[in-house]
């Protein structure tokens, strides 16, 4: 394979992995530990 193809595949896998981790953090099990600043602020 050419170097450019491998670089594109590597960057694509990195992007998909980062997106999956971000979705897991936002909506998965760790989301219960996230704080909500709007809930904490009393008007």
UniProtKB/Swiss-Prot annotation:
GO terms for cellular component: chloroplast thylakoid membrane. One of its GO terms (biological process) is photosynthesis. The keyword Transmembrane applies. It is a single-pass membrane protein. Keywords: Chloroplast, Membrane, Plastid, Thylakoid, Transmembrane, Transmembrane helix. Its main location: plastid. It is found in: Plastid, Chloroplast thylakoid membrane. Pfam families: PsbN. The chain crosses the membrane at residues 7-27. Signal peptide: none annotated. May play a role in photosystem I and II biogenesis. Belongs to the PsbN family. This is Protein PsbN. It comes from Staurastrum punctulatum. The lineage of its organism: Eukaryota, Viridiplantae, Streptophyta, Zygnematophyceae, Zygnematophycidae.
